[in-house]
Protein backbone atom coordinates (compact mmCIF):
# COMPACT_ATOMS: atom_id res chain seq x y z
CA UNK A 1 0.00 0.00 0.00
CA UNK A 2 1.32 3.51 -0.78
CA UNK A 3 2.83 5.69 1.92
CA UNK A 4 1.15 9.08 2.31
CA UNK A 5 2.36 11.89 4.57
CA UNK A 6 -0.46 12.92 6.91
CA UNK A 7 1.51 15.40 9.07
CA UNK A 8 -0.44 18.38 7.71
CA UNK A 9 -3.85 16.81 8.39
CA UNK A 10 -6.06 17.14 11.48
CA UNK A 11 -4.74 14.81 14.20
CA UNK A 12 -8.18 13.62 15.33
CA UNK A 13 -9.18 12.77 11.76
CA UNK A 14 -5.84 11.04 11.12
CA UNK A 15 -6.48 8.74 14.10
CA UNK A 16 -9.73 7.62 12.45
CA UNK A 17 -7.76 6.53 9.36
CA UNK A 18 -6.62 3.47 11.32
CA UNK A 19 -10.19 2.14 11.61
CA UNK A 20 -10.76 -1.11 9.72
CA UNK A 21 -13.37 -0.90 6.97
CA UNK A 22 -15.08 -3.88 5.33
CA UNK A 23 -13.70 -4.77 1.90
CA UNK A 24 -16.28 -6.10 -0.54
CA UNK A 25 -16.60 -7.21 -4.14
CA UNK A 26 -18.96 -5.49 -6.59
CA UNK A 27 -21.85 -7.63 -5.33
CA UNK A 28 -21.28 -6.52 -1.71
CA UNK A 29 -19.78 -9.83 -0.61
CA UNK A 30 -17.22 -9.41 2.18
CA UNK A 31 -13.70 -10.26 0.98
CA UNK A 32 -11.55 -8.80 3.76
CA UNK A 33 -10.72 -5.70 5.76
CA UNK A 34 -8.49 -2.69 5.21
CA UNK A 35 -7.75 0.59 6.96
CA UNK A 36 -9.93 3.61 6.30
CA UNK A 37 -6.77 5.30 5.04
CA UNK A 38 -6.03 2.68 2.38
CA UNK A 39 -9.70 2.47 1.37
CA UNK A 40 -9.74 6.20 0.59
CA UNK A 41 -6.50 6.56 -1.38
CA UNK A 42 -7.19 7.13 -5.08
CA UNK A 43 -4.19 4.95 -5.93
CA UNK A 44 -5.93 1.95 -4.34
CA UNK A 45 -9.39 2.91 -5.61
CA UNK A 46 -8.09 2.88 -9.18
CA UNK A 47 -6.98 -0.72 -8.58
CA UNK A 48 -10.54 -1.63 -7.59
CA UNK A 49 -10.49 -1.40 -3.78
CA UNK A 50 -14.14 -1.15 -2.70
CA UNK A 51 -15.65 -0.90 0.79
CA UNK A 52 -19.06 -0.93 2.48
CA UNK A 53 -20.62 2.36 3.60
CA UNK A 54 -23.94 3.95 4.52
CA UNK A 55 -25.80 7.24 4.13
CA UNK A 56 -28.45 8.26 6.66
CA UNK A 57 -31.34 10.57 5.76
CA UNK A 58 -33.04 11.72 8.96
CA UNK A 59 -36.35 13.58 8.76
CA UNK A 60 -38.11 15.32 11.64
CA UNK A 61 -41.87 15.15 12.21
CA UNK A 62 -42.31 18.18 9.92
CA UNK A 63 -40.77 16.06 7.14
CA UNK A 64 -37.70 18.28 6.97
CA UNK A 65 -34.37 16.64 6.17
CA UNK A 66 -31.38 17.14 8.47
CA UNK A 67 -28.30 18.19 6.51
CA UNK A 68 -24.78 18.66 7.76
CA UNK A 69 -21.82 20.62 6.46
CA UNK A 70 -18.66 18.57 6.90
CA UNK A 71 -15.98 20.24 8.99
CA UNK A 72 -12.92 21.76 7.37
CA UNK A 73 -10.88 19.18 9.32
CA UNK A 74 -12.33 16.27 7.30
CA UNK A 75 -9.81 14.59 5.02
CA UNK A 76 -12.30 13.86 2.22
CA UNK A 77 -14.76 16.49 0.98
CA UNK A 78 -14.09 19.10 3.74
CA UNK A 79 -16.63 21.90 4.01
CA UNK A 80 -19.13 20.13 1.75
CA UNK A 81 -22.85 19.98 2.51
CA UNK A 82 -24.27 16.48 2.62
CA UNK A 83 -27.04 14.28 4.02
CA UNK A 84 -27.49 13.66 7.74
CA UNK A 85 -24.64 11.21 8.26
CA UNK A 86 -22.29 9.25 5.99
CA UNK A 87 -19.74 6.73 7.22
CA UNK A 88 -18.66 3.08 7.23
CA UNK A 89 -19.43 -0.03 9.23
CA UNK A 90 -16.26 -1.40 10.81
CA UNK A 91 -14.81 -4.87 10.46
CA UNK A 92 -15.95 -6.11 13.87
CA UNK A 93 -18.52 -8.78 14.79
CA UNK A 94 -21.33 -6.35 15.66
CA UNK A 95 -21.06 -4.33 12.44
CA UNK A 96 -20.33 -7.28 10.14
CA UNK A 97 -23.78 -8.77 10.90
CA UNK A 98 -25.47 -8.94 7.48
CA UNK A 99 -28.88 -10.29 8.49
CA UNK A 100 -31.35 -7.46 7.75
CA UNK A 101 -28.31 -5.13 7.42
CA UNK A 102 -28.11 -5.07 11.21
CA UNK A 103 -24.37 -4.38 11.24
CA UNK A 104 -24.76 -1.35 9.00
CA UNK A 105 -27.67 -0.06 11.09
CA UNK A 106 -25.59 -0.46 14.26
CA UNK A 107 -22.79 1.50 12.60
CA UNK A 108 -25.24 4.24 11.66
CA UNK A 109 -26.42 4.50 15.26
CA UNK A 110 -22.78 4.76 16.40
CA UNK A 111 -21.90 7.50 13.92
CA UNK A 112 -25.09 9.52 14.53
CA UNK A 113 -23.89 9.72 18.13
CA UNK A 114 -20.25 10.44 17.24
CA UNK A 115 -20.96 13.14 14.64
CA UNK A 116 -24.24 14.71 15.70
CA UNK A 117 -24.37 13.79 19.38
CA UNK A 118 -27.73 12.02 18.98
CA UNK A 119 -28.20 9.79 22.07
CA UNK A 120 -28.03 6.08 21.20
CA UNK A 121 -31.46 5.44 22.71
CA UNK A 122 -33.06 7.97 20.34
CA UNK A 123 -32.00 6.05 17.22
CA UNK A 124 -32.11 2.30 17.98
CA UNK A 125 -31.21 0.13 14.98
CA UNK A 126 -34.82 -1.06 14.62
CA UNK A 127 -35.87 2.54 13.84
CA UNK A 128 -33.25 2.89 11.10
CA UNK A 129 -34.84 1.72 7.84
CA UNK A 130 -32.72 0.17 5.09
CA UNK A 131 -34.02 1.00 1.60
CA UNK A 132 -31.45 0.01 -1.02
CA UNK A 133 -27.78 0.29 -2.06
CA UNK A 134 -25.84 2.45 -4.50
CA UNK A 135 -22.34 1.88 -5.89
CA UNK A 136 -20.36 4.99 -6.78
CA UNK A 137 -16.80 6.31 -7.10
CA UNK A 138 -15.59 9.90 -6.65
CA UNK A 139 -12.32 11.76 -6.12
CA UNK A 140 -12.02 14.35 -3.35
CA UNK A 141 -8.62 15.64 -4.50
CA UNK A 142 -5.49 14.21 -6.12
CA UNK A 143 -4.83 11.84 -3.21
CA UNK A 144 -8.13 10.97 -1.50
CA UNK A 145 -11.46 9.67 -2.78
CA UNK A 146 -14.41 7.33 -2.27
CA UNK A 147 -15.35 3.98 -3.79
CA UNK A 148 -18.28 2.51 -1.91
CA UNK A 149 -21.39 0.43 -1.93
CA UNK A 150 -23.57 2.74 0.10
CA UNK A 151 -26.55 1.50 2.14
CA UNK A 152 -29.37 4.07 2.06
CA UNK A 153 -30.92 4.42 5.52
CA UNK A 154 -33.98 6.49 6.47
CA UNK A 155 -34.99 7.69 9.93
CA UNK A 156 -38.12 9.69 10.82
CA UNK A 157 -37.84 11.18 14.27
CA UNK A 158 -37.25 14.34 16.27
CA UNK A 159 -33.82 13.98 17.85
CA UNK A 160 -31.50 15.79 20.26
CA UNK A 161 -28.46 17.29 18.53
CA UNK A 162 -25.05 18.10 20.01
CA UNK A 163 -22.63 18.03 17.03
CA UNK A 164 -18.89 17.43 17.30
CA UNK A 165 -17.18 20.48 15.71
CA UNK A 166 -14.31 18.28 14.53
CA UNK A 167 -16.85 16.43 12.38
CA UNK A 168 -19.47 19.04 11.55
CA UNK A 169 -19.15 22.72 10.64
CA UNK A 170 -22.89 23.45 10.56
CA UNK A 171 -26.26 21.72 10.27
CA UNK A 172 -29.81 22.62 9.27
CA UNK A 173 -33.22 21.11 8.59
CA UNK A 174 -34.47 21.79 5.06
CA UNK A 175 -37.74 21.46 3.16
CA UNK A 176 -37.78 20.10 -0.39
CA UNK A 177 -37.85 23.66 -1.76
CA UNK A 178 -34.91 24.69 0.42
CA UNK A 179 -32.90 21.69 -0.72
CA UNK A 180 -33.63 22.55 -4.36
CA UNK A 181 -32.25 26.05 -3.68
CA UNK A 182 -29.16 24.51 -2.07
CA UNK A 183 -28.63 22.28 -5.12
CA UNK A 184 -28.89 25.35 -7.37
CA UNK A 185 -26.24 27.11 -5.29
CA UNK A 186 -24.00 24.07 -5.64
CA UNK A 187 -24.53 24.04 -9.41
CA UNK A 188 -23.53 27.73 -9.49
CA UNK A 189 -20.40 27.07 -7.44
CA UNK A 190 -21.60 29.09 -4.43
CA UNK A 191 -21.33 26.09 -2.10
CA UNK A 192 -19.97 22.54 -2.33
CA UNK A 193 -21.91 19.31 -1.83
CA UNK A 194 -20.61 15.76 -1.61
CA UNK A 195 -20.80 13.70 -4.81
CA UNK A 196 -22.82 10.89 -3.23
CA UNK A 197 -25.41 13.36 -1.92
CA UNK A 198 -25.62 15.00 -5.33
CA UNK A 199 -26.12 11.61 -7.02
CA UNK A 200 -28.85 10.57 -4.58
CA UNK A 201 -30.58 13.98 -4.68
CA UNK A 202 -30.64 13.99 -8.49
CA UNK A 203 -31.95 10.45 -8.85
CA UNK A 204 -33.97 9.12 -5.91
CA UNK A 205 -34.32 11.52 -3.01
CA UNK A 206 -37.33 13.63 -3.96
CA UNK A 207 -39.35 10.57 -5.00
CA UNK A 208 -38.59 8.97 -1.64
CA UNK A 209 -39.32 12.22 0.18
CA UNK A 210 -42.76 12.46 -1.47
CA UNK A 211 -43.58 9.03 -0.06
CA UNK A 212 -42.21 9.04 3.48
CA UNK A 213 -45.37 7.29 4.69
CA UNK A 214 -45.07 4.64 1.98
CA UNK A 215 -41.35 3.88 1.76
CA UNK A 216 -41.93 0.13 1.60
CA UNK A 217 -42.55 0.39 -2.14
CA UNK A 218 -38.92 1.51 -2.59
CA UNK A 219 -37.29 -1.17 -0.45
CA UNK A 220 -35.01 -3.23 -2.70
CA UNK A 221 -32.34 -5.28 -0.96
CA UNK A 222 -31.47 -7.25 -4.11
CA UNK A 223 -30.44 -4.54 -6.53
CA UNK A 224 -27.28 -2.44 -6.26
CA UNK A 225 -27.77 0.79 -8.23
CA UNK A 226 -24.60 1.47 -10.23
CA UNK A 227 -24.13 5.24 -10.43
From Swiss-Prot:
What does the UniProt cofactor note say?
Answer: Binds 1 Mg(2+) ion per subunit.
Cellular component (GO) terms are:
peroxisome
Q: What is its EC number?
A: 5.3.3.2
Protein's UniProt name: Isopentenyl-diphosphate Delta-isomerase 1
Q: Which residues bind substrate?
A: 36, 70, 74, 87
Family to which this protein belongs:
Belongs to the IPP isomerase type 1 family.
Biological process terms in GO annotation: cholesterol biosynthetic process; dimethylallyl diphosphate biosynthetic process; isopentenyl diphosphate biosynthetic process
Instruction: Report the superkingdom from the record.
Output: Eukaryota
Keyword Acetylation applies = yes
Q: MF terms per GO, please? A: isopentenyl-diphosphate delta-isomerase activity; metal ion binding
- What does the record give as its pathway? Isoprenoid biosynthesis; dimethylallyl diphosphate biosynthesis; dimethylallyl diphosphate from isopentenyl diphosphate: step 1/1
- SUPFAM superfamilies of this UniProt entry? Nudix
Spell out the catalytic residues.
Answer: 86, 148
What cofactors are annotated for this protein?
Answer: Mg(2+)
Under catalytic activity, the entry for this protein gives:
isopentenyl diphosphate = dimethylallyl diphosphate
Q: How does it assemble?
A: Monomer.
Per the entry, what this protein does is: Catalyzes the 1,3-allylic rearrangement of the homoallylic substrate isopentenyl (IPP) to its highly electrophilic allylic isomer, dimethylallyl diphosphate (DMAPP).
Q: Where does Mg(2+) bind?
A: 40, 51, 146, 148
**Short sequence motif named Microbody targeting signal, residue ranges:** 225-227
Q: Tell me the keywords, alphabetical order.
A: Acetylation, Cholesterol biosynthesis, Cholesterol metabolism, Isomerase, Isoprene biosynthesis, Lipid biosynthesis, Lipid metabolism, Magnesium, Metal-binding, Peroxisome, Steroid biosynthesis, Steroid metabolism, Sterol biosynthesis, Sterol metabolism
